[in-house]
Regions:
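Active-site proximal loop and beta-alpha junction motif in alpha/beta enzyme cores
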Residues: 2-83, 89-274
Length: 274
C-alpha cells in the first residue's frame, strides 16, 4: 500500500498499528517473536511498559518517526532494555516490508545510539549493532551455575560467554533460573562450536530482564562475532540458537560494529486501541 511513497508522506499511515514479526527464522526454526508498535505520538513510559506487559512477548518495539529517522525503544514485559537485536530486525522488517519505506539505509535513534539497517541479498535483512570487546575470565565464576566449562569470557559490561564442550552438552544444559541471578550479567550466553549446518550454536539466559531463556538473541552477536574472530580469524559467522523455538543468525564483523542478519516474516497485524 505504501510502496513508493517518500518518508515524508507516511504520516497518513500513523496510528497505533502493530505487527507480530518472527525474526531470525530458519527452515524449521520459528525465530523470536517481537511485536512492533507504530506510534502516532509519544506515550508515557508507564503506558509503554503496560502495553509490553499485556502483549507478553520477549520484546515489544515502539517505533515513531522523528524527521528522516525513527525513534526505537524496546521493552520486555518487565523492563525497558538498552539493546535488542531481534526486535530491531523486526522493526526494520515492518518499515521495509509492511510500510514500504524507501531508501537504502534506515536509521534508528535508540538508547544505544543511532543504529542502521538495510535489505541484503537472499531474503536477508541486516542491522548494525555495537561490537563488544571480549576478555577471558575464570570459569569458576560461571561453573557453579552452568556446570563444567571449557572457557569463560566477559563481553562488554552486561554479557558473559560460557563455552561448553559440544552441541549435546549445550542442548542438555539444565539451568536453575534463580541461580543465574548470582551471575553479574544481563545476558548469559552458553556457546559451543558446531551444530546442524552452522559455525556455532548458543543458548541465552536473561532472567535479570525477565527472560528465563531467550528464543533468539540478536544482541548476543555483539559478543559472539568478535569472540569467533579472535578464535578463528574469520569475520563471518553463522549461528543456530538451540531454544525451543530455534533461530538462525548470520554476522559480519567490522572495526566498531557487527552486521547481524536474518530472515523475518509477519505473523499478523492489527490495531492497538490505547
Amino acid at each position: 500500500m505504501w510502496q513508493g511513497l517518500g518518508v515524508e508522506s507516511l504520516n497518513v499511515a500513523f496510528g497505533h498499528r502493530l505487527w507480530w514479526v518472527d525474526a531470525f527464522i530458519g527452515e524449521a526454526e520459528r525465530g523470536n517473536p517481537a511485536v512492533v508498535v507504530l506510534l502516532e505520538r509519544p506515550m508515557d513510559d508507564a503506558d509503554l511498559q503496560q502495553i509490553a506487559f499485556e502483549l507478553g512477548v520477549s520484546e515489544t518495539a515502539f517505533l515513531r518517526r522523528v524527521g528522516d529517522q525513527w525513534s526505537l525503544r524496546w521493552f520486555t514485559p518487565t523492563v525497558e532494555v538498552d539493546l535488542c537485536g531481534h526486535a530491531t530486525l523486526a522493526a526494520l522488517h515492518v518499515l521495509l516490508n509492511e510500510l514500504g519505506v524507501p531508501g537504502g539505509e534506515i536509521y534508528f535513534q535508540t538508547r544505544s545510539g543511532v543504529l542502521s539497517g538495510r535489505r541484503l541479498s537472499d531474503g536477508l535483512l541486516g542491522i548494525d549493532l555495537p561490537r563488544a570487546y571480549v576478555e577471558p575470565v575464570d570459569t569458576s565464576v560461571l561453573a557453579d551455575t552452568l556446570g563444567p566449562l571449557k572457557d569463560a569470557f566477559q563481553a562488554g559490561a552486561s554479557s558473559v560467554l560460557a563455552v561448553v564442550e559440544d552441541y549435546d552438552a549445550l542442548c542438555g544444559l539444565s539451568v536453575d533460573t534463580l541461580s543465574l541471578f548470582l551471575i553479574p550479567a544481563s545476558l548469559v550466553i552458553a556457546v559451543c562450536e558446531g551444530g546442524p549446518g552452522v559455525d556455532i550454536s548458543v543458548r541465552v539466559f536473561a532472567p535479570r530482564i525477565g527472560l528465563a531463556e531467550d528464543p533468539v538473541t540478536g544482541s548476543a552477536m555483539c559478543a559472539l562475532a568478535p569472540w569467533w574472530a579472535d578464535r578463528t580469524g574469520a569475520p563471518t559467522l553463522s549461528v543456530r540458537q538451540a531454544s525451543a523455538r530455534g533461530g538462525v543468525m548470520y554476522s559480519r564483523l567490522f572495526e566498531k560494529n557487527v552486521e547481524v542478519a536474518g530472515v523475518t516474516r509477519t505473523f499478523f497485524g492489527g490495531d492497538l486501541r490505547a
